[in-house]
């Protein structure tokens, strides 16, 4: 919010759970980029639905009622795809609703809601599916990873050669602006990554090196990690734990699965050519954490 103030951006504050505030925000809005969500890998499903699905529904109603909308961009996630190894998966593969945590399941449901509005209400919308979004001001994954790297608590799952699905925030913003500038993208879905294959080992090594931390030296066999994840999740749910176990399904997906997704469509239809490589983006990201005293 402070950054928006520095840029002189006019703000209309509200909540996705407060329809009246959404009506105020939607008044006169011709272009809308919806990137708000409850993010996490643990917690009651209804808490995710209240924001990611019902909140989205209230926002759609508000922008449609305003009557001036020209383009709505819904930021989804590559997490909507089935929780398995992926090798070049593209947008022709349907999202999955099985074996999902609350966040990814509600991202699937949110996409379904947007698509229904496209069909039934003629909503002028485009869906963008980024991978793991990283960059300066990250408040979700990297802060936790940096803490564990500093404490020497990170282990590879298997060989660590499984691929990541990184998306630098600046590259994502480029795609969003390109989508908004091209009405022909209405009704389309786009996978978005850096297009720069990086393994789990390469990712973690780069973060650790830039931060000045020791590289992880040990690994957990993939089968063992999967088994421990299943047991940990079941036990934590049985005990009603409020925090995710160290090994959750979402974390296993992040560290254990091969997450290679095709971005051929966004390259072809938008001429997308990522400006920032993974190493450039992560260097800028860790520099920001260092400047903020967060290392």
Region annotations inferred by a language model:
Residues 261-269, 273, 277-295:
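Amphipathic terminal alpha-helices
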Residues 169, 205, 228-238, 242-273:
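Conserved C-terminal active-site "lid" loop/helix of NAD(P)H-dependent oxidoreductases
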Residues 3-5, 9-54:
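NAD(P)H-binding glycine-rich loop region in Rossmannoid oxidoreductase-like domains
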Residues 94-97, 127, 147-167, 171, ...:
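A conserved pocket-lining segment of Rossmann-fold NAD(P)-dependent short-chain dehydrogenase/reductase
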Residues 58-102:
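Conserved Rossmann-fold NAD(P)-dependent oxidoreductase catalytic core, especially the SDR/UDP-sugar
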Residues 85-133, 154:
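Catalytic helix-loop patch of NAD(P)-dependent Rossmann-fold dehydrogenases
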Residues 108, 121-123, 134-144, 170, ...:
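Glycine/proline-rich active-site loop of Rossmann-fold NAD(P)-dependent oxidoreductases
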Residues 179-247, 283-284:
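Mid/C-terminal beta-alpha module of Rossmann-like enzyme folds, strongest
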């Amino acid at each position: 919010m402070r950054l928006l103030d520095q840029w002189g951006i006019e703000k209309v504050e509200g909540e996705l759970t407060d329809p009246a505030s959404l009506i105020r925000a939607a008044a006169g809005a011709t272009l809308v980029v919806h990137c708000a969500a409850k993010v996490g890998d643990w917690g009651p499903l209804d808490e995710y639905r209240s924001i990611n699905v019902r909140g989205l529904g209230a926002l759609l109603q508000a922008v449609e009622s305003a009557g001036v909308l020209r383009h709505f961009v819904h930021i989804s996630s590559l997490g909507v795809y089935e929780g398995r190894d992926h090798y070049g998966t593209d947008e022709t593969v349907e999202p999955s609703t099985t074996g999902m945590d609350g966040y990814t399941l509600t991202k699937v449901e949110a996409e379904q809601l947007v698509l229904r509005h496209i069909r039934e209400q003629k909503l002028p919308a485009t869906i963008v599916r980024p991978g793991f979004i990283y960059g300066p001001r990250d408040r979700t994954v990297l802060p936790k990873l940096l803490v564990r790297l500093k404490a020497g608590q990170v282990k590879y799952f298997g060989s660590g050669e499984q691929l990541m699905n990184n998306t630098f925030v600046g590259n994502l913003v480029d795609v969003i602006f390109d989508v908004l500038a091209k009405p022909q993208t209405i009704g389309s879905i786009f996978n978005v990554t850096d297009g720069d294959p990086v393994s789990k080992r390469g990712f973690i090594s780069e973060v650790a090196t830039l931060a000045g931390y020791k590289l992880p030296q040990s690994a957990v066999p993939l089968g063992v990690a999967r088994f421990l994840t299943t047991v940990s999740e079941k036990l934590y749910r049985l005990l009603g734990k409020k925090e995710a176990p160290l090994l959750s399904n979402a974390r296993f997906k992040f560290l254990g699965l091969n997450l290679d997704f095709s971005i051929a469509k966004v390259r072809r239809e938008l001429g997308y050519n990522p400006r920032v490589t993974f190493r450039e983006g992560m260097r800028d990201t860790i520099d920001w954490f260092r400047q903020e005293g967060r290392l």
